[in-house]
Amino acid sequence: MNHVQKYLAQANRQIAELMVQIVRQRAIVKHAFDTGPRSEMAESMLNALEGSLRIFEKHRELILSQLLRQRSE
């Protein structure tokens, strides 16, 4: 496995971990909405996690394009 493949595997792991955190945070936000006043902190954390996910997905796209370039050489 070359360096690019290792970076891709790492990016995939990080994305999977973020997705799990986002699911948990969405449950926290939903619970806050269902039980009382909204929680700005919980919503802010969810927004930050979703923003991080978008960044990691873009990073993964860059890694994939580099991997494809390597294979075509």
Model region roles, listed by residue range:
Residues 1-73:
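Anionic, Ser/Thr-rich low-complexity intrinsically disordered regions
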